[in-house]
């Protein structure tokens, strides 16, 4: 797989009849019940639904943090279910960026060092990773904040650092799990406008989980989950 794949008629991500069951027998819990989702390169898709509807399980499968019980998950044409645990970890590290509700930054580490972490894991030379991290922070509007620790940043700034960290490796897809969940309305809108800009101007593929219809409206389309199923098909986002 390539970080920037050549044009391909197949979707970037294809979920077909994906089922996820936890437990066995009478204790079995069906988190996903045969869902089908296609995600094209450059898409911006929001997943919505009540707690327990299956959207977080779907996100974990997309991020190679979990595997389907049945069905097919293809990433750039590769059947993820046939990969070993180590191969899935490599796919996750090299092709998928993550943004979380809780930011997940190292508290006593500078913004620059937080953004550099994925590049350190890749073995990138210090000078090159410093430059890449600075570019990523500049792209999220944090030039001049490189030396500040997480404790010195607002919630919105911390999420910007987290987005820079997720994008510094130039992933094929960005998975954002409730990226505005810990922010007030004004900061939430700023983060969504930032994600929208990356999607429209740079063509970054984004999949987002949110409980907030106002935030989902920034996506190109919205997929509604209910009781482990995709409810009523896939609708275009309002905005």
Give, region by region, the residue ranges found by the protein language model.
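ABC-family P-loop ATPase nucleotide-binding domain
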Residues: 1-21, 231-239
């Amino acid at each position: 797989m390539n970080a920037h794949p050549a044009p391909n008629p197949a979707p970037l991500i294809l979920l077909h009849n994906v089922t996820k069951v936890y437990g066995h027998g009478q204790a079995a819990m069906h988190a996903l019940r045969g869902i089908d989702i296609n995600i094209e390169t450059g898409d911006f898709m929001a997943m919505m639904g009540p707690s327990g509807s299956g959207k977080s399980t779907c996100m974990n499968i997309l991020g190679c943090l979990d595997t389907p019980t049945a069905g097919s998950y293809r990433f750039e044409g590769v059947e993820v279910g046939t990969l070993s645990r180590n191969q899935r970890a490599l796919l996750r590290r090299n092709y998928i960026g993550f943004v979380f509700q809780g930011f997940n930054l190292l508290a006593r580490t500078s913004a620059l060092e937080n953004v550099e972490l994925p590049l350190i894991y890749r073995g990138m030379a210090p000078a090159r990773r410093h430059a890449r991290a600075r570019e990523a922070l500049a792209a999220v509007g944090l030039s001049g904040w490189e030396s500040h620790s997480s404790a010195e940043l607002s919630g919105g700034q911390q999420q910007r650092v987290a987005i820079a960290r997720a994008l510094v490796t130039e992933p094929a897809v960005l998975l954002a799990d409730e990226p505005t969940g810990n922010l007030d309305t004004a900061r939430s809108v700023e983060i969504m406008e930032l994600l929208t800009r990356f999607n429209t101007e740079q063509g970054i593929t984004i999949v987002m989980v949110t409980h907030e219809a106002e935030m989902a409206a920034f996506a190109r389309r919205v997929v509604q989950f209910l009781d482990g199923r995709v409810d009523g098909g896939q609708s275009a986002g309002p905005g």
